[in-house]
Amino acid sequence: MKPSEIREMSIEEIDAKIRELRLQLAKERGLLTMGTSLENPMVIRNLRRDIARLLTIKKEKLREREKGKVKK
């Protein structure tokens, strides 16, 4: 997921995407724990990075919102 795509999303959409990716990450980790070999081991790393990217941009948006409230 590209940062430009995330920046176009609203905070609510970002929250929904974070929940979705965390659920998917839990499933992948569960498969790994059970001893199942993953089709693509990079999936877990990519999910973690996407979640971090979403959280970072969400925090940026919240700071911008707070900054706007303070100036008014």
Curated annotation (Swiss-Prot):
Transmembrane region(s): none
Matches recorded under NCBIfam families: L29 (TIGR00012)
Keywords: Ribonucleoprotein, Ribosomal protein
GO biological process terms held by the UniProt record: translation
Record GO terms (molecular function): structural constituent of ribosome
Matching Pfam families: Ribosomal_L29 (PF00831)
Family under the similarity heading: Belongs to the universal ribosomal protein uL29 family.
GO cellular-component term (any): ribonucleoprotein complex
Keyword Transmembrane helix: no
Name of the protein: Large ribosomal subunit protein uL29
InterPro entries per UniProt: Ribosomal_uL29, Ribosomal_uL29_CS, Ribosomal_uL29_sf
Keyword set includes Membrane: no
Highest taxon listed in the record's lineage: Archaea
Assembly, per entry: Part of the 50S ribosomal subunit.
PROSITE patterns per the UniProt record, alphabetical: RIBOSOMAL_L29
Source organism: Pyrococcus furiosus (strain ATCC 43587 / DSM 3638 / JCM 8422 / Vc1)
